[in-house]
């Protein structure tokens, strides 16, 4: 028995059968176009050796396509009604593939490695606007085994995640996700392929974790780098010298640390790349040591 993907009619019938009404608070919009589903899964690069962490499986459109790739899937769904229905839907539309599916009824922001029997190698997620960035950063931090990420988010969030330094959309999320890997856009998704139809376009973003990280990845180092990113964008139009003055202890010390990191103190924080923030933290420690020696 081959896997049958869900269409618009089936999705609406499923929702009716279980007396389900989409909730705005959960950002519930379900893809019903098979071509879009195949495009997302193809762009994710998922294959049969992967263990995929799927966030927000909903009624199962993407889940079926991921299983069709031969992957093992752990689907995390916050809505108890949808989590309960998902195994039945998968069983009805496939055959032995149900044996490669695990469903958890849980808030993704509380998910930890200890909750999973096997650790994921890939993440595929349909993330609502209000939790997209926190959820993504949480999963990248807590699940280092995840090597590739494909997320579908509101177009505005996609633009922010993939923005380059100095651009109008570049900000805290843009810099922080690059701590983990390379980021690129994979196009737009029309509102018409969803039920219910959202008011905005969605965007696809892929993140590939660095094969070998250019910098330390421990939690303490990451937290210090992220603090610098937060400082820089709290008043993004300030010069770096002024933005980091309180952190460094004075404007002069801020300038000295920036110069030690080969950063022009007159540059605005919004132009700094993740490598600049990392270098600033690393060189500031060296600068402090030189002051103590003197």
UniProtKB/Swiss-Prot annotation:
Organism: Mycobacterium sp. (strain KMS)
Pfam families in alphabetical order: RrnaAD
EC number(s) from the headed UniProt entry: 2.1.1.182
SUPFAM superfamilies according to UniProt: S-adenosyl-L-methionine-dependent methyltransferases
Domain of life from the UniProt record: Bacteria
Catalysed reactions, semicolon-separated: adenosine(1518)/adenosine(1519) in 16S rRNA + 4 S-adenosyl-L-methionine = N(6)-dimethyladenosine(1518)/N(6)-dimethyladenosine(1519) in 16S rRNA + 4 S-adenosyl-L-homocysteine + 4 H(+)
Binding site for S-adenosyl-L-methionine: 29, 31, 56, 77, 107, 126
UniProt keyword S-adenosyl-L-methionine present: yes
EC class name: transferase
PANTHER family: DIMETHYLADENOSINE TRANSFERASE, DIMETHYLADENOSINE TRANSFERASE-RELATED
Cellular component terms (Gene Ontology): cytosol
Record localization: Cytoplasm
Protein name per the record: Ribosomal RNA small subunit methyltransferase A
Function: Specifically dimethylates two adjacent adenosines (A1518 and A1519) in the loop of a conserved hairpin near the 3'-end of 16S rRNA in the 30S particle. May play a critical role in biogenesis of 30S subunits.
Entry-linked Gene3D superfamilies: Ribosomal RNA adenine dimethylase-like, domain 2 (1.10.8.100), Vaccinia Virus protein VP39 (3.40.50.150)
MF terms (GO), sorted A to Z: 16S rRNA (adenine(1518)-N(6)/adenine(1519)-N(6))-dimethyltransferase activity; RNA binding
Gene: rsmA
